């Protein structure tokens, strides 16, 4: 199985093709298996937009990012917001692997996710990223984040594949506690004394510190790792897939080396949380990162397990 096969089988703009691409960019030696799911027919897509206003009084380049991918529009003096929006929309649609489609209407670029469900809400939008990028004079922009995606597939039948089969590391995109509870039950059952099949599920979640630690407290699982996705310019699914790629590669090449401080390559960092926030998250069962320049480095990778079966805190 390879990156090119994932594009061929699932479509180059699919969730699986993007996640598999992240995996194989990091790890080309450890086998990857994937499970394809249809969208929930009752689900809804995510939408967002960037609204431009004004007329350019200076030349330059407008740089707009979707999930870390940059799209540009060359701007000349006198260009209107509507003209720039048309250029930007064309640039986005030219990339047939992008996970949104774009339509320009009078200075606004409307974006619609390819997939239904909550996944599209995680696609991050940003104007300018690098220090040498700036919006041309005379033009202003307002971004509406991707939102409105709902109705994920039901994993009840899919979970049966985990029963009595060993998958050491699992990344998946659906982070509601009901879905994660199903996965935890399956992985816990696999680890019973008669089987001892280990396996861990990794997910990335964007949220506040309070909401993240509330989630991990409710999960309290020895088999689920929740990543703080606020630090990474990516969806949680791609982020989680990159992490399992790095961990499995590191485990094979340096089994006793551990994972503290290793670099997650191929992802753009966003502003990191301060140390006290990261400590609070780690203490609550959330895996965190430190950003060093353009590098994302693991602080620690933890599961959400915090209390034993008697609800006593585990030191």
Regions found by a protein language model. Give the residues of each.
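A glycine- and small-residue-enriched flexible loop/hinge signal that marks low-structured segments
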Residues: 24, 68, 90, 161-315
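Extended assembly-interface regions of large multimeric machines
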Residues: 1-58, 93, 100-105
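Structured loops at beta-to-helix junctions and adjacent beta-edge loops in soluble globular domains
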Residues: 37, 112-114, 173
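Acidic, glycine-rich low-complexity/disordered segments
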Residues: 42-49, 53-54, 139-155, 289-315
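Extended, beta-strand-rich, solvent-exposed assembly scaffolds of outer structural proteins
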Residues: 2-11, 54-126, 189
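Short, surface-exposed secondary-structure junctions/capping segments
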Residues: 18-19, 85-96, 138-145
């Amino acid at each position: 199985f390879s990156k090119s096969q994932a594009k061929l089988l699932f479509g180059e703009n699919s969730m699986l093709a993007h996640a598999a691409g992240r995996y194989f960019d990091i790890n080309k030696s450890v086998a990857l298996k994937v499970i394809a799911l249809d969208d929930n027919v009752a689900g809804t897509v995510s939408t967002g937009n960037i609204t431009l206003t004004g007329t350019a009084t200076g030349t330059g380049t407008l740089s707009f990012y979707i999930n870390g991918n940059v799209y540009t529009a060359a701007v000349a003096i006198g260009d209107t917001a509507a003209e720039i929006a048309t250029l930007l929309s064309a640039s986005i649609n030219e990339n047939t692997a992008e996970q949104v489609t774009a339509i320009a209407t009078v200075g606004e670029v409307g974006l619609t996710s390819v997939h239904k469900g909550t996944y599209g809400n995680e696609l991050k939008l940003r104007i300018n990223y690098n220090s040498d990028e700036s919006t041309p004079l005379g033009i202003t922009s307002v971004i509406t984040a991707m939102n409105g995606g709902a109705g994920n597939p039901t994993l009840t039948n899919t979970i049966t594949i985990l029963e009595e089969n060993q998958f050491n590391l699992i990344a998946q995109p659906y982070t509601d506690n009901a879905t994660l509870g199903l996965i935890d039950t399956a992985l816990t059952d696999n680890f019973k004394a008669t089987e001892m099949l280990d396996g861990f599920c990794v997910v990335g979640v964007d949220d506040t510190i309070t909401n993240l630690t509330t989630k991990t407290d409710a999960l309290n699982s020895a088999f689920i790792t929740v990543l703080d996705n606020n630090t990474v310019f990516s969806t949680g699914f791609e982020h989680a897939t990159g992490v399992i790629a790095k961990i499995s590669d590191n485990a094979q090449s340096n089994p006793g080396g551990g994972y503290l401080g290793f670099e997650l390559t191929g992802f753009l960092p966003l502003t990191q949380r301060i140390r006290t926030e990261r400590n609070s998250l780690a203490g609550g069962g959330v895996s965190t990162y430190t950003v060093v320049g353009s590098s994302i480095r693991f602080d620690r990778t933890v599961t959400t397990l915090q209390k034993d079966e008697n609800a006593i805190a585990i030191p």
